[in-house]
Each structure stands twice: as C-alpha cells, then as structure tokens.
Amino acid sequence: MSATAEEILDGLDDAQRAAAMAVDGPVRIIAGAGAGKTRTVTRRIAYACATKAWNPRSTMAVTFSVKAAAEMRSRLSKLDVAADVKAATFHSAALHQLRQVWPDVCEGPMPFICRNPRELVERSLRRVTTFQVDDDTIRNLQAEINWCKISLITPEDYARVCAATHRQPPSGLEPSQFVDVYKAYEAEKTNRNEIDFDDILLIVCHLMESDEDVASAIRSNIAWLTVDEYQDVSPLQHRLLTRWLGSNRNICVVGDPAQTIYSFAGASSYSLLNFASEFGPLTADINLNNDYRSTPQIVNYANRVLAASPQRADYLKLSSERSKGRRVAETIYGSDWEEAQGVAARIRKLVDAGESPADCAILTRVNAQQKILCKALGEQHLRYRVRRDSGWQNSALSDDAQTRLAMLEALGVGADLSGVTISTIHASKGLEFKHVFLIGCSEGLIPYGAPQEGEVLEEERRLMYVAVTRAEDTLDVSYARTREGNEGERARRVSRFFR
C-alpha cells in the first residue's frame, strides 16, 4: 500500500518539510552534516509523486557514488516509488542514455568501456617520452588526464591553462610533454575502439549539442531532476546537467559548501553558490542545519573549525538536536607509534566495555599513516579494515589472504573482518561512526604539506570539518610531537585546526 502524502512528511522538521513540499523548481537545499539530507531528498521525491505533481517515470536523481545511489533507491523503495524513479550516478545515467541513442546516430557498434586506463597511460608514456615509468608517475598522469577532462581542458588548451594558473604538470613533466602523453592516450583509445568513463559524459554532451532529436529524446525522460552533493560538481558534470535540462527549470540541487573536499580533482562549490544567479528566481532556497548525528560537543567543535576561516562567511552553523555528550578529547603523544598504541588501547577499552569494533573509526589525512595503525590494532587483537579512496581493503599485517586469516585466528580474532575502520578523511565522506579517532593533527599533515594560504588552506579546513562531523557519540583528536625518519626524530607543531 502506498504511503499518503502526509505519511511521507511525517517526522520531518520544519525546514525538511518545507524542502520536501517545494516540488516546483528551481530549488536549492544547503544541507549541513548530519542534517538528514538523504531523508529530505527522498521524501521530497516521494511526496511529489504521491501528490501527482511529478510523473515518476520522468523523474531522475543523480549523485556521485554507487553507494549513495543505492541508498537513495533503497529509501525510495520503502516509500513505494523506486520502481519508476531513476536514481543513479552521473556516469551510469549517461551510459544508459548513450546506449539508448547510439543506434540512431552511429552506424558502427558502440565503443567498449576501457577496463584498464592505467595500462593505456603507461603505454602512452613509454611511446612519447623516455621518462622513468613507475607506479606513482602513472597514477599521477592518469589523475591529470582525468582532471583535464572533467575541467573541459583539451590537449590544445593545457599549456595555456598551466601558464595562466601556474599549474605544474605531474611528475616533473613539462606541459608539452604531458600534452604528448595526453594525445597518445586519446589515440590509443581510438585505436582500440575504447572510451573511458569521462568520455561517456563528453559524448552525451556532444550528441545533445549537435543533434536536437537526440537532445529531445533524452530530455523527454527528465522532467524533474534532483542533484545530490552539488558542491562537488565538476565543469563537465555541470555541462551535462545543463544539456539534460535545456529550457526546463525543474531542478533541485542539494549540497554543502563546507564539505567541498575534491577541488584537486576538479570539483567546485561555485555552481552551488552561484545557483540562484544561474537558475533564479528560485522557488525555494532552504538551509538544513539541525544536526541529528552528532552530540552538541562535537557539533560545537566542528563549528569552531569553520568559524576560524578568515575568508568564508557562507558556511552553515550547525545546531545539534541530540542530548549532551562527552567532551571532545584532545591528546598529545610523544611519537607516531605512541599515538597509534594509545588510540588502539582506547578502542580496546571501548570494545571490552561492549562497543562493537565496527562502530569505531580512525581517520587519517593520508594513506601513509595507516600501516602503523594496523600494527597497533593487531597487537590489541582487534579486527580492522582499511579504507582508501578506491574502497574497502580488508587488511592485517600480511597481504596474503590465507596468512592473514590464519593470523587473525591465532590472535583469537576470527575470520570476521567487520572491525575497526581505518580510513583517510576523503574516503570517509558520507560515512558515520559512534566513535571517531582523528590522528595526526599537526602542521604538515592537516593542513597537509608546506604552509599554504587561500583556497588551498580552506580546503584543508573543510577536510578537518568533514572528519569531525563523521563522529556521532565521541571524538578523540590527537597528534604526535615528533616523527621518526631517515634523519632521526623531527619536531612537529600542533595543527592550527586543533581547537
């Protein structure tokens, strides 16, 4: 039995209800961390369909990750509208559209999706340069090619962009050398009749711009569009969105400028902040700042991180809807190993008191911080899993699966690897945990690298904010006074974000 309109709205706060009932676009929703963003968006879609304001078959919601799209579909299913509403990532939505229109516009078969772009980058590099080929170089070149594509920068434009913005090509290449690699990569794909994931979006844009029949066919299935995580939209994704819409203005965007943490990969909050100028007048412009996830102590800590920004006044100030919790713990350790041991011991104490290891997370700024944590957790006989940008990697002290399982069994841990999460801050986005331990809060780690100012520093501030707001019940923030390296011990300074 389908839920009634009023049942769909039941349990929403005033701001969430106002957003859910604003079914005519354009609508902007600024949703802070823990403010019930997905709940509000899915209720809005369900409410519009239940009241017959929208046709579910012409309704599409797009987001950035497979996990987020699956969560949206799951929630819509419980509201009896998932069968007809399309909830997908940008790339899966565009790929579906491309497959639908390809037979009508092209005689030959559709190109294959490149399964190993890294191999193509390596072949391209070897073909055009004598540069040393290693994993870091290949990874950096692949990332730069991706950045060019989502930033709508062609090989012909690259050198000019570098000169205008002082951008340095990766791995010590000159702009002209990178352009040669970029062109060779494109040629290699063409020779293989392959396209990469960014090409999918580029081709759909091109077809819609060059063929009005194609544009009309695609737009006929998108009368109402919802875009999640709009603060992370790239120029390429923005271009695709505008092609999907045409003259239609039934669009709702949802995002949070304070959670823009992928600028290095081409994302920008500009489209979110400039939405009213581009699509206005807006029918609704709503802020969701009631945090249902974190305690007041954690929320206040997060607010202080953002309030110290010297250049941004557009961040939402969160207000916790939870009862008072434990104060945020700030701990200073003597060394990285002492920090890892101390955090592992605290988690061991939580688990011994009845908490689940899966409710605990250790957040790091970079992957390199994670190995020592694995060792410390192993010594405490704690299960763990490591999350990098590419996803989950169940890990222990050995990379061999059988050895790893045998080791866990010998420690009395067992083969169930659903344990403590060790994650980079970037990879933790969209997740939440009862107990969060944020380590390495020193200058050079967060903020990362040499002292920076302006937007680079601001992105590091937002990273700190994202890390803090992953915590539900408790937050432990720490740093180590010294680090050990090839040159012996070196002193560290506490992070400017260590509040």
For the regions a language model picked out, list residue spans one by one.
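Conserved RecA-like helicase ATPase core segment
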Residues: 2-4, 235-333, 437
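ATP-hydrolysis module of ASCE/P-loop NTPase motor domains
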Residues: 22-23, 84, 103-194, 285-287, ...
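P-loop NTPase Walker
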Residues: 1-107, 216, 246, 300-303, ...
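Conserved two-lobed SF2 helicase motor
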Residues: 87-92, 199, 203-204, 417-426
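Conserved helicase NTPase motor core
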Residues: 5, 10-21, 25-30, 60, ...
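Helicase P-loop NTPase motor core
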Residues: 29, 35-41, 281-284, 290-384, ...
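Conserved beta-strand -> loop -> alpha-helix junction used to position metal-binding or nucleic-acid-contacting
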Residues: 84-97, 116, 382-397
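Conserved helicase C-terminal RecA-like lobe
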Residues: 370-387, 393-499
